[in-house]
């Protein structure tokens, strides 16, 4: 019969057929203990469990490796897992918990870092074996299994000794008092000594406690968030700071505080539970004043949901500002040497502080963080530019501040710190000149220019480098000043020769008479061509008074001709040896001549042994002699026999003919006729009056080509007047005026050197007479030739530089432009000399601009602006025309005058020559009218090619059918054009009315 064993109870299983008919009862068959199956525990060794644990660990590791390999092979899944792992849990706006995920870049960096770390770990620790041993020990009591527990201790097991730990007894700080007593004692000390106390809570919750004196009592005040501009629902936690607030109430007395005393500035006051305001407005034992709302005082310990409903009682902004101002002002104040008084009002002081604050830290609001960050993000150059712009925009406020002289130094400092280098054009020009040059001096100039370009932005290192380079350049320049500097002239010596010049023509016996005097022969006969035309006869019976003063355009000089009347009194005779001295000029660069960097001593002024210039003394006169010999004692040659009974003196402007007479001494007799005819017919018309020394030297060179024997001829004495830039050729009548420099040139060969263009000398441009008269005559010829085409064509052909003299007046330029003289000059010279043609092009363009300007000052400014360009072109042109030097001087004067006036205008000084310009323009207009009055109307019209262009400008073409109307319009146009300046609008309108 089947049965089921439940423990020690056997339950028989009844067949289903019997269960329906047989009545069963509660029968239980008890099985004997011997028949019950016993479940004995299986005894297994330690190695079995070790093997089983290793197997389970291996299976777990394989499953984990399979899972890791799955995630490692899928980069997207790896990225998501790493990003979630790095995410932080954050509370969302609706109270939900969300993940604050990092940026993708940080996640990728983390993944790459982990890969690198794993690879390094495999390389460094290859010996490490990871094994997991799991020991499972089933412990059964002896009563249940009857088997003793097996021990895993080895026979070498030994129990280690237990080390006793030394107990460190901390000294109790508060031995006899509680924590509350400690707080009270600390707060009392802080109250008495006015020390702020920092109260630190959890995380960032911290407040500063100070004690205020109110009505003779101390009140505790804690700092709150709204005082820093931060709004919070609960500004102070009572749970964290409750015991400290109660301690504050114990050491303060707040009974004197009333409701009406709570005003702005009371924020943070601490009131205890015994105060009536605490009992009225607070649900907590303490009241920390935050402000007021509609219901009354607001407690900072309690939550506030709407910030706008609360009127916070923090200190007033001006009070807070003044507290910070006073604190830092006192920290930075200098040491005082006097007792300060209140001499200025608070409003004025506030304005001054605001001006200086905005000058150095320009912001819209000092409390704005964006304004401060905006200034911190810009570079130093941009910050300085913003200060300069701010300085310019508020110039009126700065000008009002300048009225007080106490602020001048501060204004200069601020303005100097914000100024930038404006004239970058000059700096760029310097860089153009020195770039690509590797010499030491060019690099030094680059360093100096780089420092100057930066202006106030230059650093101290750059400034030190620039000063060092400047010092080296100065030392180098000082050692090489012998080229142009005055220091080199201190060592210049050009002593007079102690030996007399030997003239072979005067030593030949065949040319001397029995008295040893020179015999002119045929030379004397042909010299009449010079004496009759260019010399004036002196009649002794009429006296010598009118010949004493020798006039030249730049001044006067006294001759010693009056000393021909010799007194027999010794004292009076000695007075004839005394001269009249002019202002003596020192030795300058104008006294020397150089070529290829070397001095040409024969073309320089004579000096003494100490280097000072040799000044001329009285030159005694003689009768009927030709005096030659510049060095040593002079030689006296009798005049030709035909002229022996007469006395001659050269006319004004022709004293250079004495040089040609001295050359005539060395000319062969059979060639004397050709020599004198060339002088009279060719050279004198070309030289004219008062030619330059360069022109005279060129003429001597021409004569030397045809008559080579004249090159060794001795020259007359030549004195140099640097003040008037004049060369005085001394004849037999000497000179009573003394103090001139002496030219060392003694022969014609020496004189010819002045004709070289390579010779660097100012004296070669000196006139043997003067320049103003020459320039005035050229201007008169120019004005006369404006309306005379033949004369103008002759001027353009012979001396094109004369047109540059028209720049003295805008009226002359406009008239030459109307008559198309510039066009003729361009057509004539564009192929012959490109530089001269360029001058005419510039003059034509300049005149167009001048014609469009109505004011005289503006016209003169345009002319001055064009002068530097013309001056640069003129220096590269040939200087063999007589108008070259006057034109060059005119341009130089205009350039220098413009530069000087520019400096004066910048410094605020007016130009006082305006009246002079107006009067000069009126005189030129009168001169033009005077010259045109001499010409006939038919000549004015028929010789003017510009008449058709003038008619086109002022109106329509003349109707050929109406002769009377044609004559009337013709006369009106000619009168307007020839007598008035046609460049003004008034003249345009007059001509239009005349045409109608």
Curated annotation (Swiss-Prot):
The record's keywords, sorted A to Z, are: Host cell junction, Host-virus interaction, Hydrolase, Inhibition of host innate immune response by virus, Protease, Serine protease, Suppressor of RNA silencing, Transport, Viral immunoevasion, Viral movement protein
User: What residues sit in the active site?
Assistant: 226, 235, 267, 655, 728
Name the enzyme's class: hydrolase
Instruction: Output the Gene Ontology cellular-component terms.
Output: host cell plasmodesma
Might you give the EC number(s) for this enzyme? 3.4.21.-, 3.4.22.45
Q: Does the keyword Calcium apply?
A: no
Q: What is this protein called?
A: P3N-PIPO polyprotein
Q: Which organism is it from?
A: Zucchini yellow mosaic virus (strain Reunion Island) (ZYMV)
């Amino acid at each position: 019969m089947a049965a089921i064993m439940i423990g020690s109870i056997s339950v028989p299983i009844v067949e289903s057929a019997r269960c329906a008919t047989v009545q069963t009862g509660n029968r239980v068959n008890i099985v004997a203990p011997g028949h019950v199956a016993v479940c004995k525990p299986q005894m297994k060794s330690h190695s079995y469990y070790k093997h089983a644990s290793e197997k389970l660990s291996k299976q777990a590791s394989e499953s984990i490796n399979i899972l890791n390999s799955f995630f490692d092979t899928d980069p997207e899944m790896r990225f998501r897992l790493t990003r979630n792992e790095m995410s932080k849990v954050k509370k969302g706006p609706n109270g939900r918990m969300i993940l604050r995920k990092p940026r993708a870049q940080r996640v990728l960096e983390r993944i790459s870092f982990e890969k690198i770390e794993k690879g390094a770990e495999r390389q460094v620790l290859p010996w490490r074996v990871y094994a997991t041993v799991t020991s499972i020990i089933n412990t059964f009591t002896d009563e249940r299994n009857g088997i003793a527990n097996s021990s895993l201790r080895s026979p070498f097991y030994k129990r280690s000794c237990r080390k006793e730990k030394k107990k460190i007894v901390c000294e109790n700080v508060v031995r006899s008092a509680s924590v509350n007593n400690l707080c009270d004692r600390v707060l009392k000390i802080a109250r008495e000594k006015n020390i702020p106390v920092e109260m630190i809570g959890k995380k960032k919750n911290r407040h500063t406690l100070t004690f205020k004196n109110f009505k003779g009592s101390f009140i505790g005040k804690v700092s709150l968030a709204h005082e820093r501009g931060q709004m919070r629902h609960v500004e102070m936690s009572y749970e964290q700071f409750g015991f400290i607030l109660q301690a504050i109430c114990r050491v303060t007395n707040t009974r004197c505080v009333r409701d009406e005393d709570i005003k702005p500035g009371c924020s943070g006051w601490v009131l205890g539970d015994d105060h009536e305001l605490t009992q009225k407005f607070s649900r907590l034992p303490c009241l920390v004043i935050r402000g007021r709302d509609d219901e009354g005082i607001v407690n900072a310990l309690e939550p506030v949901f709407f910030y706008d409903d609360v009127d916070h009682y923090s200190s007033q902004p001006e009070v807070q500002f003044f507290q910070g101002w006073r604190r830092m002002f006192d920290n930075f104040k200098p040491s005082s040497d006097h007792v300060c008084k209140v001499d200025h009002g608070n409003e004025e002081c506030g304005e001054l502080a605001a001006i200086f604050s905005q000058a150095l830290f320009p912001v819209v609001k000092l409390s704005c963080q964006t304004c401060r960050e905006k200034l911190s993000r810009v570079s130093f150059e941009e910050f300085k530019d913003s200060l300069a712009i701010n300085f310019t925009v508020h110039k009126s406020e700065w000008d009002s501040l300048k009225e007080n002289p106490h602020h001048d130094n501060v204004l200069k400092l601020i303005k100097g710190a914000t100024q930038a280098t404006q004239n970058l054009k000059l700096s760029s020009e310097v860089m153009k000149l020195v770039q690509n040059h590797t010499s030491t001096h060019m690099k030094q100039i680059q360093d100096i220019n780089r420092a100057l370009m930066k202006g106030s932005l230059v650093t101290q290192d750059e400034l030190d480098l620039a000063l060092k380079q400047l010092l080296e350049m100065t030392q180098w320049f000082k050692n090489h000043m012998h080229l142009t500097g005055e220091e080199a002239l201190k060592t210049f010596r050009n002593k007079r020769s102690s030996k007399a010049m030997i003239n072979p023509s005067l030593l030949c016996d065949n040319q001397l008479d029995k008295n040893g005097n020179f015999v002119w022969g045929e030379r004397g006969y042909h010299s009449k061509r010079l004496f009759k035309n260019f010399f004036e006869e002196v009649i002794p019976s009429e006296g010598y008074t009118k010949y004493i003063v020798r006039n030249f355009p730049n001044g006067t000089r006294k001759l010693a001709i009056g000393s021909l009347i010799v007194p027999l009194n010794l004292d009076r005779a000695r007075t004839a040896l005394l001269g009249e001295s002019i202002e003596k000029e020192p030795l300058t660069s104008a006294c020397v001549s150089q070529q290829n960097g070397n001095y040409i001593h024969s073309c320089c002024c004579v000096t003494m042994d100490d280097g000072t210039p040799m000044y001329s003394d009285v030159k005694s006169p003689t009768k009927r002699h030709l005096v030659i010999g510049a060095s040593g004692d002079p030689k006296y040659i009798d005049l030709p026999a035909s002229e022996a009974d007469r006395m001659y003196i050269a006319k004004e402007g022709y004293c250079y003919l004495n040089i040609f007479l001295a050359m005539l001494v060395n000319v062969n007799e059979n060639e004397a006729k050709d020599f004198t005819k060339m002088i009279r017919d060719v050279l004198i018309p070309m030289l004219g009056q008062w030619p330059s020394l360069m022109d005279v030297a060129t003429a001597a060179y021409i004569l030397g080509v045809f008559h080579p024997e004249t090159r060794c001829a001795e020259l007359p004495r030549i004195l140099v007047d640097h003040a008037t830039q004049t060369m005085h050729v001394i004849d037999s009548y000497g000179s009573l005026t003394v103090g001139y420099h002496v030219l060392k040139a003694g022969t014609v060969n020496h004189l010819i050197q002045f004709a070289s263009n390579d010779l660097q000398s100012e004296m070669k441009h000196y006139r043997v007479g003067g320049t103003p008269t020459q320039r005035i005559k050229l201007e008169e010829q120019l004005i006369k030739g404006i309306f005379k085409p033949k004369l103008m064509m002759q001027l353009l052909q012979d001396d094109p530089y004369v047109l540059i003299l028209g720049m003295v007046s805008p009226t002359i330029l406009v008239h030459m432009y109307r008559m198309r003289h510039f066009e003729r000059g361009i057509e004539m010279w564009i192929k012959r000399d490109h530089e001269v043609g360029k001058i005419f092009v510039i003059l034509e363009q300049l005149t167009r601009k001048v014609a469009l300007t109505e004011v005289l000052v503006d016209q003169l400014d345009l002319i001055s602006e064009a002068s530097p360009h013309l001056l640069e072109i003129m220096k590269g042109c040939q200087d063999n025309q007589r108008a070259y030097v006057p034109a060059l001087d005119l341009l130089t004067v205009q350039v220098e005058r413009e530069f000087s006036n520019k400096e004066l205008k910048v410094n605020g000084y007016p130009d006082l020559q305006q009246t002079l310009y107006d009067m000069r323009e009126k005189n030129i207009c009168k001169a033009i009218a005077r010259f045109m009055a001499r010409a006939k109307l038919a000549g004015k019209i028929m010789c003017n090619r510009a008449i058709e262009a003038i008619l086109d400008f002022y109106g329509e073409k003349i109707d050929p059918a109406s002769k009377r109307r044609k004559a009337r319009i013709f006369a009106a146009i000619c009168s307007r054009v020839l007598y008035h300046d046609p460049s003004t609008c008034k003249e345009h309108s007059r001509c239009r009315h005349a045409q109608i």
